[in-house]
Every structure is written in structure tokens, then in C-alpha cells.
């Protein structure tokens, strides 16, 4: 009986050990499966991160790519452009373009500026001097004839002639009235040379004109 009990106990102990081994194996398997699942999850996370990073890089490349294409269209050739013309051909000379003066408004404005800056010189008309008519009271006396220092035969011939009216004499204003800006040169009068048997009318024509209010030569009173 004791032997049977011992054998049962040994069998139970072995069964327990077997169960424990099974449990340990199961736990090991579960741990290994959990480790595999963890690694698989980690791989999925890494893959997702790599895909997200790749997507962002692709978006950046898509944004940069059209700008690079536009630059490549504007500057298609990076190297120097070869000259197709031969070196012995001279360049064409450019003839200067001559613009006529009537097309330039600045040139047309120069004469107007000159006209405004330098006014035109206006000539003043010669003033008309008053003419006094000859009256009978204007006559020479014997004392005036003596002052002329004329020869005696000429004076005697004048004495026997009747008095005649003389042409009107021109009255000149004093020199202060004349304009200083435009001086007028008067002709130099020629002195009369008395001749023998010369009438008084011809002699008076050669007399010098008297300036100022002094009256001209007068006829001789007989």
C-alpha cells in the first residue's frame, strides 16, 4: 500500500512539474508573441513616420519644382552663346538722326524768351516844332544892318527895295527837351558868303536858323 501511495505522489509531482513546464512554455510563447507584436507595432510606427516624412518632402519638392522650371525657361543656356557672325564683318554704323528745328518746342520758345528779355527798340517820332508866321512888325532897323557888317553897295541896294514878307521860320525847343537816349544830329549850317548885287531874299535863305525864342532875321525898314 505504501508503495502505491508513493507512486501516486511521484506521479502527481511529475504531473505538476509537467504542468509548470507547460505554463512556463506558454508564458514564454506569450512573451515571445508579445515581443513580436511590439516589434511589429514599432515597425508600423517607424513606417508611418517615414511615410509622413516622405510626403512632406514630396510636397516641398512639388512647391520648389515649378519655380525651378520657370528659372530654367528664362535662362535656358548657362554657357556663353557662340557668335554666329564671322569676325571680319564690321558693325553697322548708326547714322545720327537729325531732328528739324520745328519739331522741337524748346527751340521755338527761345525767340519768345529773347523778345521778352530784350524788348524791341521803338523809334520816337521827330517832334513837330511850332512855326510862327511872319508879321509886318518883324523888321530890321538901320542899327541891325550896321551890326551885320555888310558892304555899303549891298546895303544901298537893299535900302531902295520895298519890304517883302519872308517865309515862316521854324522854332526849335531848348536842348533840355530833347531825349538823351536818342540824340538827333542837326545838319551843320553853312555860313552865307555875301555877294555883290545879291537880293535880300537870297541872302536870308543862307542865314543860320536861330535857336530858342529869339525871332529870325527881319526885313529892313526904309
Swiss-Prot record:
It comes from the Eukaryota. It is found in: Secreted. This is Beta-casein. Mammary gland specific. Secreted in milk. Important role in determination of the surface properties of the casein micelles. InterPro entries: Casein, Casein_beta, Casein_CS. The modification Phosphoserine is found at residues 30, 32-34. Belongs to the beta-casein family. The modification Phosphothreonine is found at residue 27. Residues 1-15 form the signal peptide. Keywords: Milk protein, Phosphoprotein, Secreted, Signal. One of its GO terms (cellular component) is extracellular space.
Amino acid at each position: 500500500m505504501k508503495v502505491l501511495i508513493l507512486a501516486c505522489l511521484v506521479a502527481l509531482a511529475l504531473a505538476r512539474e509537467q504542468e509548470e513546464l507547460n505554463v512556463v512554455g506558454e508564458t514564454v510563447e506569450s512573451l515571445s508573441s508579445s515581443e513580436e507584436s511590439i516589434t511589429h507595432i514599432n515597425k508600423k510606427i517607424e513606417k508611418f513616420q517615414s511615410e509622413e516624412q516622405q510626403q512632406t518632402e514630396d510636397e516641398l519638392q512639388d512647391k520648389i519644382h515649378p519655380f525651378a522650371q520657370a528659372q530654367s525657361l528664362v535662362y535656358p543656356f548657362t554657357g556663353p552663346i557662340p557668335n554666329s557672325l564671322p569676325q571680319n564683318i564690321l558693325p553697322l554704323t548708326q547714322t545720327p538722326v537729325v531732328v528739324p528745328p520745328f519739331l522741337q518746342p524748346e527751340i521755338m520758345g527761345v525767340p519768345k524768351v529773347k523778345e521778352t528779355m530784350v524788348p524791341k527798340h521803338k523809334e520816337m517820332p521827330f517832334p513837330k516844332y511850332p512855326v510862327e508866321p511872319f508879321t509886318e512888325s518883324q523888321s530890321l532897323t538901320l542899327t541891325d544892318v550896321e551890326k551885320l557888317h555888310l558892304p555899303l553897295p549891298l546895303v544901298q541896294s537893299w535900302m531902295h527895295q520895298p519890304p517883302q514878307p519872308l517865309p515862316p521860320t521854324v522854332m526849335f525847343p531848348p536842348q533840355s527837351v530833347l531825349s538823351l537816349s536818342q540824340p538827333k544830329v542837326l545838319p551843320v549850317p553853312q555860313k552865307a558868303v555875301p555877294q555883290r548885287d545879291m537880293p535880300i531874299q537870297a541872302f536870308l535863305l543862307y542865314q543860320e536858323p536861330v535857336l530858342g525864342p529869339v525871332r529870325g532875321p527881319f526885313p529892313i525898314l526904309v
